[in-house]
Amino acid sequence: MARSDDADSRAARWEKEAHDLSTQVAFLQEELALVRRKLTESPRHVRQLEERLAAAQAQLARLTENNERLVSTLKEARAQIVTLKEEIDRLAQPPSGYGIFLERHDDGTVDVFTGGRKLRVAVSPSLDVAELCRGQEVLLNDALNIVDAFGYERAGEVVMLKEVLAGPDGAPGDRALVVSHSDEERVVHLAETLIGAAIRAGDSLMIEPRSAYAYERIPKSEVEELVLEEVPDVDYTDIGGLHAQIEQIRDAVELPFLHADLFREHQLRPPKGILLYGPPGCGKTLIAKAVANSLAKKIAERRGEEKHTSYFLNIKGPELLNKYVGETERHIRLIFQRAREKAGEGTPVIVFFDEMDSVFRTRGSGVSSDVENTIVPQLLSEIDGVEGLENVIVIGASNREDMIDPAILRPGRLDVKIKIERPDAEAAKDIFSKYILSGLPLHPDDLAEHGGEPQATVAAMIDAVVLRMYSETEENRFLEVTYANGDKDVLYFKDFNSGAMIQNIVDRGKKMAIKEFLTSARKGLRLQHLLDACVDEFRENEDLPNTTNPDDWARISGKKGERIVYIRTLVSGGKGADAGRSIETASNTGQYL
């Protein structure tokens, strides 16, 4: 019985355990199914999580970008607020005035000129008072204190400097006497830029009338035309056919300059001036330029210097004339004043008046407006004033010396008178040799005729061209002139030849050689080119004598003597072959040589 109860209890326990186990198995099966289901669904869940994570990251980036944009916008807004505040503050500030700095004081204050008043004001600590210069423009605040400094005034009135007033104890002056356009004299202050500067009487200065300060030297064309310029590099060797005249001018100019002690020992006064007269185009201006260059070289050699310097005032007559009364005389004074300044430094100065007859005509002749009644005396006084200077000489050039006032030509003024003649045949050869050189491209045919020698070819060309120009043949007949006494004379082209015409002939020939090379590829200058150039030059000049007054034309051309009343051209086959006409002169004026 006991054994049966025990078995029942064990069976019941086993049954219970079996039930529990089956329950656990069922639970585990459910868990296993759940796990299997989760394992099946986990990749999709992971993808969803990844997608959500990516979306969250993208949203975070957008939010970050928006945040940065908002921060930047906020900064810009703050900057704009600050700028607008500064702009409002600036616009609300009272206006600032400008003034002219005058003088500084030991207590740190300065004097300024503003609004027509002279004030003593303070200076901002940010500015160095020692750096302020007289005449400088300064900025004043509402309390009229200097807060900034600028440059100098750049606009104002132009006046002429008459004199720089010396300072105490011979120090450089800081004031000047100036003359306005209304001839009103005024004393002005010189700005720092002009104190001690190389300004001289006659210079144009820019002033500010209210503050009475002169700021700047203004170059004016009417004055700068007369400024000394260094001599061009022209030597006597560049001039052909004028050996005798060059020797004369050397004796007149170089000897007194180079041997001044001998002249003083012999009590010989050097000439003050030279007149070069003769027909146009014969080298008067060229000689004047060569004089200064040669003189400077000789002085440099004598002093043992390498660099030679001289100055050449090339004054063309018509440039001096001015419609305002007294201006021409002022220009003449300015010319000689500049010459004296440079001559005082020991530098030779040549004052060259070209076309002298256009300004310094005979007084009282009635030929012009009689402006020479005051111009000629001004020149005479200046020439006489050059007497004490050892380094200035006046050279005048004219092709109508008979119209120059006799007082200028008398001894003691233009002492030496040198006639620059038209070149003869030998002189023409010399001039041609300056332009036709053996280094030029010569045509092979011409070279072959002279054994291939360039020198011989050039010499033959020159001889042939000069023979063509100077032969008294029918083709070279130019004019038949009739004088007032009834005499007639035939003039040839050689009677009107000049250095300028020779140069023009050579230039024409060279141009023909170039054109022939471009068309036929045959290079080189030929004799025929020069002969054709002679013909063209003659043809071009055949109409020139047909002027209103044949006698005046003849005098300008260098033909002096009996008055000419009739001119007839003799050029055959030209456009002026029948151009003869009779023209009576209005009056018998001038001195006939």
Curated annotation (Swiss-Prot):
It comes from the Bacteria. The keyword Cytoplasm does not apply. GO terms for cellular component: proteasome complex. InterPro entries: AAA+_ATPase, AAA_ATPase_domain, ATPase_AAA_core, ATPase_AAA_CS, NA-bd_OB-fold, P-loop_NTPase, Prot_ATP_ID_OB_2nd, Prot_ATP_ID_OB_N. Residues 592-593 are annotated as: Docks into pockets in the proteasome alpha-ring. Residues 5-94 form a coiled coil. Residues 584-593 have a biased composition (Polar residues). Keywords: ATP-binding, Chaperone, Coiled coil, Nucleotide-binding, Proteasome. One of its GO terms (biological process) is modification-dependent protein catabolic process. Consists of three main regions, an N-terminal coiled-coil domain that binds to protein Pup and functions as a docking station, an interdomain involved in ARC hexamerization, and a C-terminal ATPase domain of the AAA type. ATPase which is responsible for recognizing, binding, unfolding and translocation of pupylated proteins into the bacterial 20S proteasome core particle. May be essential for opening the gate of the 20S proteasome via an interaction with its C-terminus, thereby allowing substrate entry and access to the site of proteolysis. Thus, the C-termini of the proteasomal ATPase may function like a 'key in a lock' to induce gate opening and therefore regulate proteolysis. This is Proteasome-associated ATPase. It comes from Salinispora arenicola (strain CNS-205).
